[in-house]
């Protein structure tokens, strides 16, 4: 829920009903601005326990458009980013070096495994598990979940060599995770129809 601000008293009141910017818990230092169309956009740094190449550590997440609908924050992939993923592919091996996108609806107990990174539906939530693609960093969380969903079980997943972003129901919730050593494979459970783009 948004905060309330009393300008005359210069006081902010926080709601008891809060939601996280991202449910992957890897993002920090969010930064906000407006784009050329006046949309509120945000980006943040991705926390990583080690450098993937031994040199640089951390990266910016995909810019997202922030909207409040019915008191709920939606964080949607910026349309200028989304339109870059226009060519259909059949496997990650066909993807450009900029990564790829997977769109799918997850039925009950449906799952997708992206090179060792698992996304699955559990009851009314979408969950992720990066334990197989996180180089045994046991000091960090590896399992994540959205709160109960209201808008369905659609996911748009943006895959990069060291970052996976799961947009659930066009931004109802988002899970961003740092990853290492992803395999170039994608598998889906029974009843999961998915489409890939690069």
Task: Label the model's feature ranges.
Residues 1-2:
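Loop/turn-rich, solvent-exposed surfaces of beta-rich toroidal or solenoidal domains
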Residues 5-198:
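Beta-rich accessory regions
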């Amino acid at each position: 829920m948004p905060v309330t601000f009393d300008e005359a008293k210069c006081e902010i009141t926080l709601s008891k009903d809060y939601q996280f910017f991202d449910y992957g818990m890897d993002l920090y230092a969010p930064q906000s601005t407006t784009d050329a169309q006046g949309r509120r956009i945000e980006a943040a740094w991705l926390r990583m326990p080690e450098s993937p190449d031994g040199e640089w550590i951390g990266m910016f997440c995909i810019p997202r458009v922030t909207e409040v609908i019915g008191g709920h924050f939606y964080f949607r992939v910026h349309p200028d980013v989304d339109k870059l993923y226009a060519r259909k592919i059949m496997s990650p091996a066909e993807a450009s070096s900029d990564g790829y996108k997977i769109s799918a609806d997850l039925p009950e107990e449906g799952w997708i495994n992206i090179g060792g990174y698992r996304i699955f539906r559990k009851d009314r939530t979408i969950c992720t598990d990066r334990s197989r693609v996180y180089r045994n960093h046991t000091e960090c969380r590896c399992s994540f979940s959205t709160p109960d969903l209201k808008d369905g079980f659609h996911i748009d997943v943006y895959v990069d060599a060291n970052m996976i972003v799961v947009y659930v129901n066009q931004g109802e919730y988002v899970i961003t995770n740092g990853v290492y050593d992803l395999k170039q494979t994608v598998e889906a459970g029974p009843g999961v129809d998915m489409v890939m783009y690069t």
